[in-house]
Amino acid sequence: MDHYRPVWDIWSQFILSQTDSALRRDGLQETFPIEIPGGEHLVINTSTAPIIYSKGGSVLRQIRGFIGDDAFQRGLRDYLRRHAYGCADSLQFWEAFETVSDQPVSEIMRAWVEQPGHPLVRVHRDGQTLTLSQERFTYLPGDFQGCWPIPLTLRLFDPDGSERWMRVLMRGKTLQVDIGAAEAVKINDGQAGFYRVFYERYADLTALGKRVRDRQLSAEDRWGLQSDLFARVQAGEVAFRAYLAFLECYAEEDAFLPLVSIDGHLRHSHLIGDAATREAAAVAGRQIAERVLASIGWHPAPEEAHVTAALRDQLLWHAVLYGSEAAQAFADGAFQPVSYTHLTLPTKEAGCGGG
């Protein structure tokens, strides 16, 4: 779909509606694996669907990112051809990808679908050595077991302006990688992996923040950096003010995915934080909303992208909650025709999304 309709920005919508929701649900202490052992009955509801469907699809996207588009397509075609008009199980599905890619897909997928939760990859740099360690990510602390074979894709930025990519499979609890003289390293390039990343040295995050500001990173990566950082805020490991400081790198951000995510995080903080947090979130949210609305327009434009309309709806609603006088004036003006005799479709004038 992305190939034929790139204007739909379908992968941004997938990450926001599927991957992000699955990460949030799977970060709770009480979660469960994608595949329930022994064929145990499971009711599909708002608690289980983000794991079975959203996490399941996201883990498939992780495999696609690790073995590549071509191998993924060939594996899928081979699987469908071999089992046409017949029955097959998930193991045969993984074997199809393993055959065409020569990668241990079955080993990876068994660990990812049979155990609950997902990993947090901690990143510590010492000179030219990157030490990675993994643990289960949860918002609340706990003593959890689990180890995942993590398909890692690293993007390295060298001092001469060149870039390098590395793909490694992290099978154990720790892994050391020689990154040479790289100035910055982005773990989980393209945000294909279903895991959180935490850069323990703020200097390493700052180096990536420069790439955010200069647009050297994709919209998916710009989303992932701040999303993972906010997850650590929610877990109590990072202060909210540190998150706000990192958002300064997004001062000129105009892409749907990072913007709608940042606004959502600020709205969450504004909703449940203490007085100081609420005020700081309102100031930041108001500045972002007013800047972006001035850029994309307060009214829908002919033939504009769906994601632009969705972004406007969310920002208009939240800008009013943040105390934006400009948004309040616009909302009042748009409401007047509706409140009297003129028949105006709210979705065309001031359509507001939910909180």
Describe every region a protein language model picked out.
Residues 1-143, 268, 272, 276-295:
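Hydrophobic alpha-helical and helix-loop surface patches within well-folded domains
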Residues 20-21, 27, 49-50, 56, ...:
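Long, ordered, helix-rich scaffold segments
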Residues 37, 63, 133-135, 155-157, ...:
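Structured loops at beta-to-helix junctions and adjacent beta-edge loops in soluble globular domains
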Residues 38, 89, 172, 198-201, ...:
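Solvent-exposed, flexible loop/coil residues
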Residues 68, 171-173, 188, 344:
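Residue-level detector of functionally special positions within alpha-helical transmembrane segments
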Residues 93, 150-152, 315:
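Generic structural signal for hydrophobic residues
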Residues 105-106, 118-186:
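Beta-strand-rich binding/interaction modules
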Residues 338, 342-354:
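Residue-level detector of conserved catalytic or cofactor/ligand-binding positions
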